């Protein structure tokens, strides 16, 4: 079976968030089960692909040329789509993002002949199921929602001038939502199957509270909606072989974890107390502001905080301020540092994730694999992966009191080492999720 994956991100070539980890890992796992996988991503600035030729697509009344490049990683072929729009410093954050990714998808559609199935990821690939239904290419389509909050919304006049699509697709093709083009809705309505990244999140997005304005659409399409829990790259995230750890360790010998902890605290001047790690984007979704509000209570509980992350400038400034005020108890490192992230997962005693919503979450899986019990809000994929008092700690309230309660539960557990060992025994590999996707693919292709 030949399967094309279309995404704006794929590790290790383009990563902003967890989408990249999924698209980088799932095809590799599927290849081990007999799938011939190809990943299509934009040819971002700095990617050193092998140029193989040019392609053409119709856009805004003219004929547009795009470059085609190839890369390989983990036995999977990557196809790079070269457009001038993507020769920039970062994948997103530009006023013309919508237009850029519409062009990307129209170019990709020209190369999808011969695939049995096309697996589209988030709004940046959500137009493709409609293009398939309009006859641009053949093969079945799966659309995966990684984060419903980002929907790809734009005015209709520009869109139809660019694409030349039939005007009746505005309503009949599922593009219209609340008076604008909504690519997320388009993908949901037109794909043969819709998945999201955890069973709990698949339910949450059908509710008014979690549906981001699309809950009615999702309820109407519930018959083809399925939650498949993401896996983790357990070869990369492995405390026994981690290249970023000076002292590796395993479930049978935790001495390397204790050495990593001692060196981490000493290097950053933290007191020898229970230390809670945070590795996160500073975004409203992640509940980072709740940690700030909980700082006085957490200091009274006697824990340290070690925070690595960046994002909203006001949160960065606030963490820098509290870290300065609580020297020896709070460390804040701005930005993302891969080696330091590994040391935090390994060297902290607990790991905090107070997310407002969390489609799946990978950090809690990594923390458990590294023997660091996660303290998480009971939402989305966190519910599906963490068992309270068994492999970690869950709290309900979306406020500073909830954060305090979760950390206090962690502190009062009589055998936190057993919780850590239970977490290390969990299987978060891609083998099971890949099998579930393969079952889905086979069913769709057989009835295509």
Q: Positions of the model-derived regions?
A:
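Catalytic cores of nucleotide-sugar-dependent glycosyltransferases that transfer UDP/GDP/TDP-activated
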Residues: 1-448
């Amino acid at each position: 079976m030949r399967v094309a994956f279309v995404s704006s991100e794929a590790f290790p070539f383009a990563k902003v968030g967890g989408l990249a980890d999924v698209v980088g890992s799932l095809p590799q796992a599927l290849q081990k089960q007999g799938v011939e996988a190809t990943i299509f991503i934009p040819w971002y600035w700095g990617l050193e692909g092998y140029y193989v030729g040019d392609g053409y697509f119709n856009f805004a009344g003219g004929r547009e040329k795009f470059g085609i490049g190839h890369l390989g990683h983990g036995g999977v072929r990557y196809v790079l789509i070269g457009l001038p729009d993507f020769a920039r410093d970062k994948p997103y954050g530009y006023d013309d993002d919508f237009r850029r990714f519409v062009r990307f998808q129209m170019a990709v559609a020209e190369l999808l002949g011969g695939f049995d199935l096309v697996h589209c990821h988030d709004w940046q690939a959500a137009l493709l199921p409609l293009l398939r239904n309009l006859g641009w290419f053949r093969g079945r389509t799966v659309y995966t929602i990684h984060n419903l909050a980002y929907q790809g919304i734009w005015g209709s006049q520009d869109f139809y001038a660019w694409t030349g699509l039939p005007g009746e697709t505005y309503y009949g093709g599922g593009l219209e939502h609340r008076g604008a083009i909504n690519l997320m809705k388009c993908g949901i309505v037109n794909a043969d199957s819709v998945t999201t990244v955890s069973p709990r999140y698949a339910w949450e997005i059908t509710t008014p509270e979690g549906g981001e304005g699309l809950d009615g659409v999702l309820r109407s399409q519930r018959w083809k909606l399925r939650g498949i829990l993401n896996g983790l790259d357990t070869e990369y995230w492995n405390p026994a072989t981690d290249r970023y750890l000076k002292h590796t360790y395993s479930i049978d010998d935790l001495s390397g974890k204790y050495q990593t902890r001692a060196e981490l605290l000493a290097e950053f001047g933290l007191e020898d107390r229970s230390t809670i790690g945070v590795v996160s984007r500073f975004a409203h979704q992640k509940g980072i502001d709740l940690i700030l509000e909980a700082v006085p209570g957490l200091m009274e509980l006697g824990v340290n905080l070690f925070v690595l992350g960046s994002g909203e400038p006001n949160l960065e400034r606030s963490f820098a301020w509290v870290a300065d005020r609580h020297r020896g108890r709070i460390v804040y490192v701005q930005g993302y540092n891969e080696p330091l992230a590994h040391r935090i997962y390994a060297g902290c005693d607990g790991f905090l994730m107070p997310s407002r919503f969390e489609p799946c979450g990978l950090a809690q899986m990594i923390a458990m694999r590294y023997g660091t019990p996660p303290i998480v809000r009971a939402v989305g994929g966190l519910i599906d992966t963490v068992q309270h008092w068994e492999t970690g700690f869950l709290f309900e309230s979306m406020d500073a009191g909830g954060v305090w309660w979760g950390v206090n539960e962690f502190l009062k557990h009589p055998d936190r080492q057993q919780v850590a060992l239970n977490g290390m025994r969990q299987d978060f590999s891609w083998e099971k999720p890949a099998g579930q996707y393969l079952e889905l693919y086979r069913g769709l292709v057989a009835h295509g």
